[in-house]
Amino acid sequence: LTDMAEPPIAELEALDQRAAGTISELGLSAQTIDLLRDRAHLKAYYLNDPAGAVALLEEGIALPTIDPKTKAQLKLDLGDVHLLAGDMWDASLLYSQVDLDFKYDMLGHEARLRNAKVSFYAGDFLWAQAQLQVLKSSTSKLIANDAMELSLRITDNLGLDSNSVPLSYFARAELLRYQHRYDESLAVLDSLNEAFPGHALGDDILYERYRIAYARHRYEEAAGHLTKLLELFPFDILVDNALLDLGRLYEERLNDTEKAMKTYERLLFEQTGSIFVPEARTRYRRLRGDDLDGPPEPAAPSPQP
């Protein structure tokens, strides 16, 4: 249901009520906490009810029977909802708590990455950079890769003159996209292009336009943005991301197996050092008809809602 471009609100509300009924019947416990998280996600990202999501997550955090890691995950969820609602500092506080409590755990690394993004959105690029430095050596390849990409974006686009205005534009657009304010985000990206034509952020702008089109389920348009990125910026750090995302678009959304295979093959041969190679190889072999056990490797998540 939530995978539809415009899911009927009445059906989403009915789904929410069924989840509420199940939790009420079984009681809120460690066994039903995942259902509470799902319900909070539904409220925040599909029913435009972040306040309702906050109330649910706070109820879960207050539950005395859940383990520390589950409580930390609930705090991350709550931080995400606060960020969605525009409460950046509440989000940062929650991320900081998880970072402090799980400093040497993957949860702590994820919390620090999210906190670095908050600093990035707020325009505090140097502080974001300081947080990212530690994460580059994370044992999670995805976290380390995300930290490296954001760190390089800051380094490459501040420039020797330390002009942070273009990057501030982009950070604003990215935050608006995260908050589902897509038209506003696109308007900021347009303004960035007009004010700073030919800026080094050109590849990032195209990738952001792809993420917005994907979130709106406009898959042909999304594929167009990725194709343009690959044509105009063939040596950029986002190329492997773009190739994997484009292959998945062809495979899962546009039902074009031939183009999907060609895109995965290009990633395998042109981006041999990418962390996405294992997933691309698995997907390529599956489409080729090889006998593989298990689903494709979930190495790279789809763009955020």
Model-predicted segments: where are they?
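Acidic, polar-rich low-complexity tracts and alpha-helical solenoid repeat scaffolds
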Residues: 1-305
